[in-house]
Each structure stands twice: as structure tokens, then as C-alpha cells.
Design a protein with these regions (language model features):
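Alpha/beta-hydrolase active-site loop signature
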Residues: 84, 108-112, 151, 176, ...
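Active-site loop/oxyanion-hole signature of alpha/beta-hydrolase fold enzymes
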Residues: 61, 69, 105-149, 160, ...
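Conserved serine/cysteine hydrolase catalytic core
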Residues: 245-294
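Flexible "cap/lid" loop of the alpha/beta hydrolase fold
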Residues: 155, 166-208
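Catalytic active-site module of serine/aspartate enzymes centered on a nucleophile-bearing elbow/loop
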Residues: 299-332
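Conserved HGGG/HGGXW glycine-rich cap/lid loop of the alpha/beta-hydrolase fold
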Residues: 61-116
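Alpha/beta-hydrolase fold catalytic core
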Residues: 2-6, 22-77, 99-101, 139, ...
């Protein structure tokens, strides 16, 4: 009976999240506390330790209610998560940075606590959603940080709207073009970060459990994701799994468009603000991140070692180092 009541309570909470405007403390929106499984000094032991955390929402011009996580005061710092990711995974990053900034993490459409809809599954629409978030917040100038696909969303934003309003930008381990053109040289492929020559096979492998190998997709992020060799990462993933119910069919809608975009022209010609790029030696994306740092004027590359958790999930596995490095860049 207790299990039934718990499930019913959670279902009602999730229903309220999906159907109402959100503007409340995270504890109130989620309907319960959460205890992180592994104690980590300097990070919250329970959700209730993060008293400043709120979950809010706004509605886009095409009628989609998007959630965003917010904490802290000061200069705005806006995070855009990667494919299928959400603000809950940023719990430790937000906790550390909200002591210095107004930190905002957007749940993109079909991800996290945002609406699941059958339309708008394109990076260009995600970039418009980001623009509409800033308009909703009344933010005229902010620092932006995109991880994985979130970096592509910011590149799309820059392509559409330019860099006005972007004070500084941070990109974390996103290939410049996941799709590898068949007429590329090997050097061009490495510089762009291409990992597949078949977007269809890659999407099927990632979303439907289709056959996968290193010729259809980069297997390393999946291998590194399964490692729970960081207590902070284990905690943030446990929290996200407990409070966010991801629908694979919904998150899959943007993936084909994401895979086939080639951002080399935007990265090499349209970025004119200070940029930090994060990657590491446990990521196959490092060569493309070096290329990006070489073509963006004044860009700084942070390449983490294996001991520093330098893989696709570095910001979650080593949040103390990441937030320290990011703060140093933002305050330069």
C-alpha cells in the first residue's frame, strides 16, 4: 500500500510539473527530498541542502512549456545540456557556481521536465528556444556554456542571432560535425570530429539498440558513462534518474538533425567573444576541440587528463575542478 501511495504521489507530482507553470523551490516542484547515495565533501548530501534551487518554466512561441533550473544571484550564467540530458544532472555544478552567479540550466524540449511534443526536433528550433528563454528572463548579457549537443545549440544561436548578448562562451566536448563526409581527408575528419558516415545507423544504434560499432558511432562516451568511478557523478545521475522520466522516443526526434549539422563555418568565422573549450584525453573529441581552439580567436582549451576525469562527462565527474576552471575563465 505504501509503495502504491508513493507511486501515486510521484505520478501526481510529475503530472503537475507537465501541466502547470512552474515557479517554485525545487523541493516543492518535485514533491520530496532526495538523499545522494555517496557523501562528497563540499557538495550537498540532500536536495534540501540546496535551499536556493528553483524550477521555473516559460512557454515558447510555438506553445511548448520549457522548464529551467535556477539558483544564485549575480551575473547570469546559462547552461544548455546535451542530447537527452537535463538540469537535474547539473545539481553539483549548480550548487558550486550559484555561490557566485545566477545559474540557469534549460531543459530543452522533449528533455528533462519540459514538454514532450512531436514538433520542433531541429537544432535551429532549440536555438530559438534558447533565445526565447533569454527574452523571458529579460537577460541582455550573459555567459553561456553548452555541453555536448548543447554546444551545437549555442552555435545555432550564434548563427541565427550573432554574439550580441553573449559576454563569454564555454563549449564542452562537442564535435564540430558528427557526420563524416565521405570526400573528407582523414585530417578533415579529425578536425571536425566526424564519427559516422551513416546518420541513420547511428540514430538507430543510439535510440533503438541497433547494431553499433566504432564505424557507426563513437562508443567511448557510452563506455565512460557506465563507469561510476566518480562519487559526484554517481550522485547526480542517481538524482536525475529519480526525478526525471526520460522518453527515448521524444528525445530521439532531434538526433538526426543534430548528427547531420556541420558547424565548421560558424565555429571558424562567427564567434568573436572569449571562448573556453573543455575536453580531455579520455575523449575521442579532443582533436576536434584542438581544431576549434585554433580557429576561434583567443580561445582557451582545457584538456583534462585521465586522472582528472577527462572524458565526455568531465563537468559532472569532476565538478570542483570544472567549476574552478570555468570561474577562472569567466573572471579573467
Amino acid at each position: 500500500m505504501r509503495k502504491f501511495l508513493l507511486r501515486a504521489t510521484c505520478a501526481l507530482a510529475l503530472s503537475a510539473i507537465a501541466g502547470q507553470a512552474l515557479a517554485a523551490p525545487a523541493m516543492q516542484v518535485l514533491g520530496r527530498d532526495f538523499s545522494f547515495p555517496q557523501p562528497v565533501e563540499g557538495l550537498p548530501a540532500k536536495l534540501s541542502d540546496f535551499k536556493d534551487l528553483q524550477i521555473n518554466s516559460f512557454t515558447t512561441s510555438d506553445g511548448v512549456k520549457l522548464a529551467y533550473w535556477e539558483a544564485g544571484k549575480g551575473r547570469p550564467l546559462i547552461f544548455v545540456p546535451g542530447w537527452s540530458a537535463n538540469g537535474a544532472e547539473y545539481i553539483n555544478v549548480m550548487y558550486l557556481l550559484s555561490q557566485h552567479y545566477r545559474v540557469i540550466v534549460l531543459d530543452p524540449r522533449n528533455q528533462g521536465l519540459s514538454d514532450q511534443v512531436a514538433y520542433g526536433g531541429r537544432i535551429a528550433r532549440f536555438s530559438m528556444d534558447l533565445k526565447e528563454l533569454t527574452d523571458h528572463l529579460g537577460v541582455k548579457s550573459a555567459d553561456y556554456c553548452g555541453w555536448s549537443m548543447g554546444a551545437a545549440v549555442i552555435w545555432g544561436y550564434i548563427d541565427l542571432f550573432g554574439t550580441k548578448g553573449i559576454r563569454k562562451a564555454c563549449f564542452v566536448d562537442e564535435p564540430i560535425s558528427i557526420y563524416s563526409h565521405q570526400d573528407w581527408t582523414e585530417q578533415q575528419r579529425r578536425d571536425a570530429g566526424g564519427t559516422t558516415t551513416s546518420a541513420e545507423r547511428m540514430v538507430a544504434a543510439v535510440t533503438q539498440g541497433g547494431p553499433a560499432n566504432s564505424l557507426t558511432t563513437d562508443m567511448k562516451p557510452f563506455e565512460r558513462f557506465m563507469l561510476r568511478d566518480s562519487a559526484a557523478f554517481a550522485n547526480s545521475e542517481a538524482f536525475a534518474a529519480a526525478v526525471v522520466k526520460t522518453d527515448p522516443d521524444a528525445t530521439a526526434r532531434v538526433l538526426f538533425d543534430h548528427v547531420t549539422n556541420d558547424w565548421r563555418d560558424v565555429v571558424s568565422h562567427k564567434i568573436d567573444v572569449p571562448v573556453a573549450i573543455f575536453s580531455g584525453e579520455e575523449s575521442n573529441n579532443l582533436p576536434s576541440q584542438r581544431w576549434a581552439a585554433s580557429v576561434i580567436p583567443g580561445a582557451r582549451l582545457y584538456a583534462y587528463t585521465a586522472a582528472e576525469q577527462g572524458d565526455h562527462f568531465l563537468m559532472f565527474k569532476n565538478p570542483v575542478k570544472f567549476t574552478t576552471d570555468l570561474r577562472a575563465f569567466l573572471e579573467r
